[in-house]
């Protein structure tokens, strides 16, 4: 319902939000809006948490992914396996250690790019409250009380 499609709009979900953010930063072409859906936001997590995630992934990828998919689901979710793309260890490492930069967000605003962030209060993947607090000074934040990571 909120995803907009257009020539001057960049959007991304979860890890894809990091990719969309970097694309908007690096783009020489016109960008009017950046939409971030449940952006991967782990910069408030400690190093131990991140190391454990990577260790569990390396030890048993299938069990890690099964647990991850279970955490994605909420009451309204049907099957999500068809939409899931397995990532690599390197991608998980990038996702966990990515730092959203206030300076980069300010740069996007200076370029005239409107930023929208969509978060679910019941998200079991990221700390959506921390993400809301971080993004609210740079973006219009939509915080859905009854939604999880999949919104």
Language-model-detected regions and their locations in the chain:
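Conserved acidic catalytic loop of the alpha/beta-hydrolase fold
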Residues: 1-8
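Gly/Ala-rich beta-loop-alpha elbow adjacent to hydrolase catalytic centers
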Residues: 12-20
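Flexible "cap/lid" loop of the alpha/beta hydrolase fold
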Residues: 25-59, 90-100, 104
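Helix-loop "lid/cap" segments that line or gate small-molecule binding pockets
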Residues: 52-56, 66-78, 94-95
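Short beta-strand/loop motif that positions the catalytic acidic residue
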Residues: 111, 116-119, 123
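Short alpha-helix in the alpha/beta-hydrolase fold that links the catalytic acid
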Residues: 113, 127-138
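Catalytic histidine-centered segment of alpha/beta-hydrolase-like enzymes
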Residues: 124-125, 141-151
């Amino acid at each position: 319902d909120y995803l907009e499609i257009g020539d001057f709009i960049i959007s991304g979900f979860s890890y894809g939000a990091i990719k969309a953010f970097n694309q908007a930063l690096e783009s020489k072409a016109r960008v009017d809006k950046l939409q971030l859906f449940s952006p991967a936001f782990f910069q408030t997590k400690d190093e131990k948490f991140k190391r454990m995630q990577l260790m569990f992934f390396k030890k048993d990828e299938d069990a890690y992914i099964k647990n991850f998919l279970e955490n994605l689901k909420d009451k309204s979710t049907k099957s999500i396996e068809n939409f899931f793309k397995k990532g690599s260890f390197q991608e998980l490492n990038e996702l966990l250690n990515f730092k959203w930069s206030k300076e980069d967000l300010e740069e996007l605003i200076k370029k005239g790019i409107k930023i929208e962030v969509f978060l679910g209060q019941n998200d079991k993947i990221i700390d959506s409250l921390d993400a809301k607090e971080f993004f609210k000074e740079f973006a219009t934040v939509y915080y859905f009380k009854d939604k999880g990571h999949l919104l």
